[in-house]
Design a protein with these regions (language model features):
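ATP/NTP phosphate-donor binding region
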Residues: 1-92, 348
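Fold-independent oxyanion-binding glycine-rich loops
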Residues: 16-17, 38-40, 69, 96-98, ...
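Short Gly/Thr/Asp-enriched flexible loops that form oxyanion-binding sites at enzyme active sites
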Residues: 51-52, 82, 101-115, 148-149
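Glycine/serine-rich anion-binding loops at beta->alpha junctions
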Residues: 90-106, 140-146, 281
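A glycine/threonine-rich phosphate-anchoring loop and its flanking beta-alpha core
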Residues: 114-214, 309
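Active-site segments that bind and position negatively charged phosphate/pyrophosphate groups
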Residues: 204, 208-334
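C-terminal charged capping/lid subdomain of soluble metabolic enzymes
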Residues: 314, 318-395
Protein backbone atom coordinates (compact mmCIF):
# COMPACT_ATOMS: atom_id res chain seq x y z
CA UNK A 1 0.00 0.00 0.00
CA UNK A 2 1.34 3.40 -1.01
CA UNK A 3 1.47 6.36 1.38
CA UNK A 4 -1.57 8.62 1.04
CA UNK A 5 -3.36 11.64 2.48
CA UNK A 6 -7.11 11.32 2.81
CA UNK A 7 -9.08 14.49 3.50
CA UNK A 8 -12.80 15.10 2.97
CA UNK A 9 -13.68 18.57 4.27
CA UNK A 10 -17.17 18.53 2.73
CA UNK A 11 -19.97 18.31 5.29
CA UNK A 12 -22.82 16.18 3.93
CA UNK A 13 -26.49 16.64 4.84
CA UNK A 14 -28.20 13.49 3.56
CA UNK A 15 -31.89 12.63 3.44
CA UNK A 16 -35.41 13.83 2.76
CA UNK A 17 -36.02 17.60 2.92
CA UNK A 18 -32.45 18.38 3.96
CA UNK A 19 -32.46 21.17 1.35
CA UNK A 20 -34.78 23.13 3.63
CA UNK A 21 -31.82 23.68 5.97
CA UNK A 22 -29.81 25.53 3.33
CA UNK A 23 -30.56 29.02 4.65
CA UNK A 24 -29.36 28.24 8.16
CA UNK A 25 -26.32 26.39 6.81
CA UNK A 26 -25.21 29.29 4.62
CA UNK A 27 -25.94 31.81 7.38
CA UNK A 28 -23.04 30.26 9.32
CA UNK A 29 -20.69 31.66 6.64
CA UNK A 30 -22.04 35.22 7.11
CA UNK A 31 -22.10 35.98 3.38
CA UNK A 32 -22.77 39.44 1.98
CA UNK A 33 -24.32 38.00 -1.16
CA UNK A 34 -24.81 34.50 -2.55
CA UNK A 35 -24.68 33.50 -6.21
CA UNK A 36 -27.36 30.86 -6.78
CA UNK A 37 -26.15 28.92 -9.81
CA UNK A 38 -28.32 26.40 -11.66
CA UNK A 39 -29.02 24.79 -15.02
CA UNK A 40 -32.21 25.00 -17.06
CA UNK A 41 -35.85 25.50 -16.22
CA UNK A 42 -36.31 22.25 -14.31
CA UNK A 43 -34.97 23.71 -11.06
CA UNK A 44 -37.59 26.45 -11.29
CA UNK A 45 -40.47 24.29 -12.55
CA UNK A 46 -39.94 21.68 -9.85
CA UNK A 47 -40.27 24.35 -7.18
CA UNK A 48 -36.81 23.58 -5.79
CA UNK A 49 -35.32 26.95 -6.67
CA UNK A 50 -38.19 28.80 -5.02
CA UNK A 51 -37.79 26.67 -1.89
CA UNK A 52 -34.08 27.38 -1.75
CA UNK A 53 -34.47 31.11 -2.28
CA UNK A 54 -37.22 31.31 0.35
CA UNK A 55 -34.85 29.63 2.79
CA UNK A 56 -32.26 32.32 2.03
CA UNK A 57 -34.81 35.09 2.49
CA UNK A 58 -35.82 33.67 5.87
CA UNK A 59 -32.22 34.18 6.99
CA UNK A 60 -32.04 37.66 5.40
CA UNK A 61 -29.38 36.46 2.97
CA UNK A 62 -29.07 38.49 -0.22
CA UNK A 63 -28.61 36.55 -3.43
CA UNK A 64 -28.37 36.85 -7.19
CA UNK A 65 -29.21 34.14 -9.74
CA UNK A 66 -27.34 32.75 -12.71
CA UNK A 67 -28.87 29.87 -14.68
CA UNK A 68 -28.09 28.35 -18.03
CA UNK A 69 -25.53 25.66 -17.21
CA UNK A 70 -25.49 22.91 -19.85
CA UNK A 71 -24.08 19.39 -19.79
CA UNK A 72 -20.32 19.68 -20.19
CA UNK A 73 -20.32 23.16 -18.55
CA UNK A 74 -18.84 25.88 -20.70
CA UNK A 75 -16.27 28.61 -20.16
CA UNK A 76 -18.38 31.55 -21.42
CA UNK A 77 -20.98 31.06 -18.67
CA UNK A 78 -18.20 30.71 -16.10
CA UNK A 79 -16.81 34.05 -17.25
CA UNK A 80 -20.30 35.55 -17.08
CA UNK A 81 -20.66 34.27 -13.53
CA UNK A 82 -17.34 35.79 -12.53
CA UNK A 83 -18.29 39.17 -13.95
CA UNK A 84 -21.71 39.02 -12.31
CA UNK A 85 -20.10 38.08 -9.01
CA UNK A 86 -17.69 41.00 -9.18
CA UNK A 87 -20.50 43.43 -9.96
CA UNK A 88 -22.78 42.13 -7.20
CA UNK A 89 -20.15 41.57 -4.51
CA UNK A 90 -20.73 37.82 -4.31
CA UNK A 91 -18.74 36.04 -1.61
CA UNK A 92 -20.51 32.64 -1.56
CA UNK A 93 -21.55 30.34 -4.41
CA UNK A 94 -24.47 27.92 -4.11
CA UNK A 95 -24.85 25.27 -6.80
CA UNK A 96 -28.32 23.79 -7.32
CA UNK A 97 -28.15 20.93 -9.81
CA UNK A 98 -25.98 18.09 -11.02
CA UNK A 99 -22.27 17.77 -11.65
CA UNK A 100 -22.19 20.29 -14.48
CA UNK A 101 -23.71 22.99 -12.28
CA UNK A 102 -21.35 22.10 -9.44
CA UNK A 103 -18.27 22.24 -11.66
CA UNK A 104 -19.35 25.56 -13.14
CA UNK A 105 -19.85 26.88 -9.59
CA UNK A 106 -16.38 25.73 -8.55
CA UNK A 107 -14.82 27.49 -11.53
CA UNK A 108 -16.72 30.69 -10.75
CA UNK A 109 -15.63 30.54 -7.10
CA UNK A 110 -12.01 30.10 -8.18
CA UNK A 111 -12.25 32.93 -10.68
CA UNK A 112 -13.85 35.36 -8.22
CA UNK A 113 -11.24 34.64 -5.56
CA UNK A 114 -8.34 35.12 -8.00
CA UNK A 115 -9.44 38.02 -10.24
CA UNK A 116 -5.91 38.68 -11.43
CA UNK A 117 -5.77 35.29 -13.22
CA UNK A 118 -7.75 34.18 -16.28
CA UNK A 119 -9.89 31.31 -15.00
CA UNK A 120 -9.10 29.16 -18.05
CA UNK A 121 -5.43 29.20 -17.02
CA UNK A 122 -6.41 27.04 -14.04
CA UNK A 123 -7.68 24.41 -16.47
CA UNK A 124 -4.69 24.59 -18.82
CA UNK A 125 -2.13 24.03 -16.08
CA UNK A 126 -0.77 27.57 -16.40
CA UNK A 127 -1.83 28.59 -12.88
CA UNK A 128 -3.16 27.14 -9.63
CA UNK A 129 -5.84 28.87 -7.54
CA UNK A 130 -4.26 30.32 -4.42
CA UNK A 131 -7.64 30.73 -2.76
CA UNK A 132 -11.32 30.25 -3.49
CA UNK A 133 -14.73 31.36 -2.26
CA UNK A 134 -16.79 29.22 0.11
CA UNK A 135 -19.35 27.18 -1.77
CA UNK A 136 -22.06 24.61 -1.27
CA UNK A 137 -24.23 22.31 -3.32
CA UNK A 138 -27.77 21.00 -3.43
CA UNK A 139 -27.46 17.88 -5.54
CA UNK A 140 -30.19 16.89 -8.01
CA UNK A 141 -28.37 14.18 -9.99
CA UNK A 142 -26.34 11.19 -8.83
CA UNK A 143 -23.48 10.93 -11.29
CA UNK A 144 -20.35 13.07 -11.36
CA UNK A 145 -19.51 13.02 -7.66
CA UNK A 146 -18.56 16.69 -7.84
CA UNK A 147 -20.32 17.26 -4.52
CA UNK A 148 -17.35 15.74 -2.66
CA UNK A 149 -14.61 15.67 -5.27
CA UNK A 150 -11.55 17.86 -5.73
CA UNK A 151 -12.21 17.98 -9.47
CA UNK A 152 -13.67 20.67 -11.72
CA UNK A 153 -14.02 20.13 -15.48
CA UNK A 154 -14.92 22.91 -17.92
CA UNK A 155 -15.31 22.93 -21.73
CA UNK A 156 -14.05 25.69 -23.98
CA UNK A 157 -16.36 25.79 -27.03
CA UNK A 158 -13.98 28.07 -28.93
CA UNK A 159 -11.16 25.54 -28.90
CA UNK A 160 -13.13 22.30 -28.45
CA UNK A 161 -11.08 21.54 -25.34
CA UNK A 162 -12.44 19.99 -22.14
CA UNK A 163 -10.00 20.38 -19.28
CA UNK A 164 -9.92 19.61 -15.59
CA UNK A 165 -8.59 21.55 -12.64
CA UNK A 166 -7.90 19.53 -9.50
CA UNK A 167 -7.13 20.46 -5.92
CA UNK A 168 -8.47 20.75 -2.40
CA UNK A 169 -9.71 24.24 -3.25
CA UNK A 170 -12.45 22.58 -5.33
CA UNK A 171 -14.03 20.79 -2.38
CA UNK A 172 -17.50 21.98 -1.49
CA UNK A 173 -17.89 23.29 2.06
CA UNK A 174 -21.16 21.39 2.26
CA UNK A 175 -23.33 19.17 0.10
CA UNK A 176 -27.05 18.60 0.56
CA UNK A 177 -28.18 15.24 -0.83
CA UNK A 178 -31.91 14.52 -0.88
CA UNK A 179 -32.57 11.40 -2.98
CA UNK A 180 -36.15 12.56 -3.62
CA UNK A 181 -34.75 15.34 -5.80
CA UNK A 182 -33.55 12.68 -8.26
CA UNK A 183 -36.95 11.01 -8.76
CA UNK A 184 -37.57 12.94 -11.99
CA UNK A 185 -34.19 12.14 -13.57
CA UNK A 186 -34.80 10.46 -16.93
CA UNK A 187 -33.90 6.79 -17.49
CA UNK A 188 -31.13 7.83 -19.90
CA UNK A 189 -29.56 10.26 -17.45
CA UNK A 190 -29.96 7.74 -14.65
CA UNK A 191 -28.02 5.21 -16.73
CA UNK A 192 -25.37 7.80 -17.64
CA UNK A 193 -25.02 8.59 -13.96
CA UNK A 194 -24.62 4.94 -13.05
CA UNK A 195 -21.79 4.59 -15.57
CA UNK A 196 -20.01 7.70 -14.31
CA UNK A 197 -20.27 6.62 -10.67
CA UNK A 198 -19.02 3.12 -11.38
CA UNK A 199 -16.26 4.40 -13.63
CA UNK A 200 -14.88 6.74 -10.98
CA UNK A 201 -14.38 3.64 -8.86
CA UNK A 202 -13.37 1.17 -11.58
CA UNK A 203 -10.72 3.50 -12.94
CA UNK A 204 -9.17 3.88 -9.50
CA UNK A 205 -9.37 0.11 -9.06
CA UNK A 206 -7.10 -0.32 -12.07
CA UNK A 207 -4.52 2.27 -11.05
CA UNK A 208 -1.10 0.93 -9.98
CA UNK A 209 -0.85 -0.20 -6.37
CA UNK A 210 -0.45 -3.36 -4.33
CA UNK A 211 -1.83 -4.85 -1.11
CA UNK A 212 -4.87 -2.57 -0.89
CA UNK A 213 -7.43 -5.24 -0.08
CA UNK A 214 -9.48 -2.97 2.19
CA UNK A 215 -9.66 -0.23 -0.44
CA UNK A 216 -10.38 -2.90 -3.05
CA UNK A 217 -13.26 -4.30 -1.01
CA UNK A 218 -14.81 -0.85 -0.62
CA UNK A 219 -14.45 -0.26 -4.36
CA UNK A 220 -16.00 -3.60 -5.26
CA UNK A 221 -18.94 -2.90 -2.96
CA UNK A 222 -19.52 0.50 -4.56
CA UNK A 223 -19.41 -0.96 -8.08
CA UNK A 224 -21.87 -3.75 -7.29
CA UNK A 225 -24.16 -1.47 -5.29
CA UNK A 226 -24.41 1.00 -8.16
CA UNK A 227 -25.25 -1.78 -10.59
CA UNK A 228 -28.11 -2.96 -8.37
CA UNK A 229 -29.35 0.53 -7.52
CA UNK A 230 -29.34 1.64 -11.15
CA UNK A 231 -31.43 -1.36 -12.16
CA UNK A 232 -33.91 -0.65 -9.38
CA UNK A 233 -34.10 3.05 -10.32
CA UNK A 234 -34.85 2.16 -13.93
CA UNK A 235 -37.67 -0.15 -12.82
CA UNK A 236 -39.12 2.37 -10.37
CA UNK A 237 -37.84 5.96 -10.58
CA UNK A 238 -39.33 6.73 -7.15
CA UNK A 239 -37.61 3.89 -5.31
CA UNK A 240 -36.14 5.90 -2.42
CA UNK A 241 -33.73 3.19 -1.32
CA UNK A 242 -32.30 2.80 -4.82
CA UNK A 243 -32.02 6.55 -5.38
CA UNK A 244 -30.38 6.97 -1.97
CA UNK A 245 -27.80 4.29 -2.66
CA UNK A 246 -27.06 5.80 -6.07
CA UNK A 247 -26.61 9.24 -4.56
CA UNK A 248 -24.33 8.13 -1.75
CA UNK A 249 -22.30 5.97 -4.13
CA UNK A 250 -21.81 9.05 -6.32
CA UNK A 251 -20.14 10.81 -3.40
CA UNK A 252 -18.01 7.89 -2.22
CA UNK A 253 -16.84 7.03 -5.72
CA UNK A 254 -15.15 10.39 -6.28
CA UNK A 255 -14.07 11.68 -2.87
CA UNK A 256 -10.78 9.76 -2.83
CA UNK A 257 -11.89 6.88 -0.63
CA UNK A 258 -11.62 4.22 -3.32
CA UNK A 259 -8.07 5.24 -4.30
CA UNK A 260 -6.42 5.15 -0.87
CA UNK A 261 -3.05 3.43 -1.18
CA UNK A 262 -3.05 3.40 -4.98
CA UNK A 263 -1.78 5.77 -7.64
CA UNK A 264 -4.38 7.92 -9.33
CA UNK A 265 -5.17 8.78 -12.91
CA UNK A 266 -8.55 8.48 -14.60
CA UNK A 267 -7.33 7.26 -17.99
CA UNK A 268 -10.70 6.54 -19.61
CA UNK A 269 -11.97 9.88 -18.35
CA UNK A 270 -9.09 11.53 -20.20
CA UNK A 271 -10.04 9.64 -23.35
CA UNK A 272 -13.67 10.66 -22.94
CA UNK A 273 -12.99 14.33 -22.24
CA UNK A 274 -11.68 14.72 -25.78
CA UNK A 275 -14.82 13.13 -27.19
CA UNK A 276 -17.32 15.32 -25.33
CA UNK A 277 -15.03 18.31 -25.83
CA UNK A 278 -15.27 17.86 -29.60
CA UNK A 279 -18.89 16.63 -29.45
CA UNK A 280 -20.47 18.60 -26.56
CA UNK A 281 -23.83 16.90 -27.10
CA UNK A 282 -22.31 13.63 -25.86
CA UNK A 283 -23.23 12.88 -22.25
CA UNK A 284 -20.14 12.12 -20.19
CA UNK A 285 -21.43 8.79 -18.89
CA UNK A 286 -22.38 7.65 -22.38
CA UNK A 287 -18.92 8.54 -23.64
CA UNK A 288 -17.32 6.52 -20.85
CA UNK A 289 -19.48 3.50 -21.66
CA UNK A 290 -18.53 3.74 -25.32
CA UNK A 291 -14.80 3.73 -24.51
CA UNK A 292 -14.21 1.61 -21.43
CA UNK A 293 -14.53 -1.88 -22.87
CA UNK A 294 -12.18 -1.11 -25.76
CA UNK A 295 -9.66 0.34 -23.32
CA UNK A 296 -10.04 -2.75 -21.13
CA UNK A 297 -9.42 -5.14 -24.01
CA UNK A 298 -6.32 -3.16 -25.00
CA UNK A 299 -4.65 -3.00 -21.57
CA UNK A 300 -5.71 -6.02 -19.50
CA UNK A 301 -2.71 -8.19 -20.38
CA UNK A 302 -0.49 -5.71 -18.52
CA UNK A 303 -1.92 -6.98 -15.21
CA UNK A 304 -3.67 -10.31 -15.56
CA UNK A 305 -4.00 -10.93 -11.82
CA UNK A 306 -5.74 -7.63 -11.19
CA UNK A 307 -8.26 -8.28 -13.92
CA UNK A 308 -8.90 -11.80 -12.62
CA UNK A 309 -9.67 -10.29 -9.21
CA UNK A 310 -12.13 -7.92 -10.87
CA UNK A 311 -13.76 -10.75 -12.83
CA UNK A 312 -14.13 -12.86 -9.70
CA UNK A 313 -15.09 -10.27 -7.08
CA UNK A 314 -17.22 -7.92 -9.18
CA UNK A 315 -18.81 -10.29 -11.69
CA UNK A 316 -18.72 -13.51 -9.64
CA UNK A 317 -16.86 -15.51 -12.28
CA UNK A 318 -14.96 -18.70 -11.55
CA UNK A 319 -11.37 -18.27 -12.70
CA UNK A 320 -10.17 -20.52 -15.50
CA UNK A 321 -6.55 -20.89 -14.38
CA UNK A 322 -5.58 -22.74 -17.54
CA UNK A 323 -6.99 -19.96 -19.72
CA UNK A 324 -7.15 -16.86 -17.48
CA UNK A 325 -7.60 -14.50 -20.42
CA UNK A 326 -10.93 -16.16 -21.22
CA UNK A 327 -12.17 -15.28 -17.73
CA UNK A 328 -11.14 -11.65 -18.18
CA UNK A 329 -12.67 -11.40 -21.64
CA UNK A 330 -15.91 -12.82 -20.25
CA UNK A 331 -15.95 -10.15 -17.54
CA UNK A 332 -15.37 -7.38 -20.08
CA UNK A 333 -18.13 -8.81 -22.28
CA UNK A 334 -20.47 -8.88 -19.29
CA UNK A 335 -19.68 -5.24 -18.57
CA UNK A 336 -20.39 -4.39 -22.20
CA UNK A 337 -23.66 -6.31 -22.18
CA UNK A 338 -24.65 -4.53 -18.99
CA UNK A 339 -24.10 -1.14 -20.61
CA UNK A 340 -26.25 -2.15 -23.56
CA UNK A 341 -28.98 -3.45 -21.24
CA UNK A 342 -29.39 -0.04 -19.58
CA UNK A 343 -29.41 1.83 -22.88
CA UNK A 344 -25.78 2.92 -22.96
CA UNK A 345 -23.63 2.87 -26.11
CA UNK A 346 -20.82 0.36 -26.47
CA UNK A 347 -18.99 2.21 -29.23
CA UNK A 348 -18.24 5.70 -30.52
CA UNK A 349 -20.19 5.27 -33.73
CA UNK A 350 -23.41 5.17 -31.69
CA UNK A 351 -22.57 8.63 -30.38
CA UNK A 352 -22.18 10.14 -33.83
CA UNK A 353 -18.40 10.37 -33.68
CA UNK A 354 -16.87 10.52 -37.15
CA UNK A 355 -14.06 8.20 -38.14
CA UNK A 356 -12.13 11.11 -39.64
CA UNK A 357 -11.99 12.74 -36.19
CA UNK A 358 -10.26 9.85 -34.42
CA UNK A 359 -6.71 11.00 -35.20
CA UNK A 360 -7.51 14.52 -33.97
CA UNK A 361 -8.98 13.09 -30.78
CA UNK A 362 -5.78 11.09 -30.20
CA UNK A 363 -3.59 14.11 -30.92
CA UNK A 364 -5.55 16.25 -28.49
CA UNK A 365 -5.56 13.57 -25.81
CA UNK A 366 -1.80 13.10 -26.13
CA UNK A 367 -1.28 16.89 -26.25
CA UNK A 368 0.17 16.63 -29.74
CA UNK A 369 2.16 13.51 -28.82
CA UNK A 370 3.84 15.17 -25.81
CA UNK A 371 2.21 13.12 -23.04
CA UNK A 372 1.23 9.56 -22.27
CA UNK A 373 -1.66 8.46 -20.08
CA UNK A 374 -0.12 6.65 -17.14
CA UNK A 375 -1.44 3.41 -15.72
CA UNK A 376 -0.47 -0.26 -15.66
CA UNK A 377 0.05 0.19 -19.39
CA UNK A 378 1.19 3.72 -20.39
CA UNK A 379 -0.69 4.99 -23.43
CA UNK A 380 1.12 7.14 -25.99
CA UNK A 381 -0.49 8.71 -29.05
CA UNK A 382 -0.37 5.47 -31.05
CA UNK A 383 -2.03 3.49 -28.25
CA UNK A 384 -4.71 6.12 -27.74
CA UNK A 385 -5.51 6.12 -31.45
CA UNK A 386 -5.87 2.33 -31.47
CA UNK A 387 -8.31 2.49 -28.54
CA UNK A 388 -10.40 5.15 -30.29
CA UNK A 389 -10.40 3.00 -33.44
CA UNK A 390 -11.44 -0.09 -31.49
CA UNK A 391 -14.23 1.85 -29.78
CA UNK A 392 -15.40 3.22 -33.12
CA UNK A 393 -15.68 -0.25 -34.62
CA UNK A 394 -17.70 -1.54 -31.63
CA UNK A 395 -20.59 0.85 -32.23
Amino acid sequence: MNNFIYETPTKVYFGKDEELKVGKIIAEFHPKKVLVHFGGNSARKSGLLDKVENCLREENISFVELGGVVANPELPLVREGIELGKKEGVDFVLAVGGGSVLDSSKAIANGLANPEVDVWDFHCGKAVPQKTLPKGAILTLAAAGSEMSSSCVISNPETGEKRGCNGLFNRMNFAIEDPVLTYTVSPYQTACGAVDIAMHTIERYFCPGEDTYLTDSIAEAVIKSVRKAAGDCLKNPEDYTARANMMWASSLAHNGLTQCGREFQLVVHQLEHEVSGMYPEVAHGAGLAALWCSWARYVYKANINRWLQYASNVWGLDIDFEHPEKTIETAINMQEQYYASIGMPIGLKELGVKKDDLAKLALDCSRNKTRSLIGYKPLAYEDILVIYQMAYERG
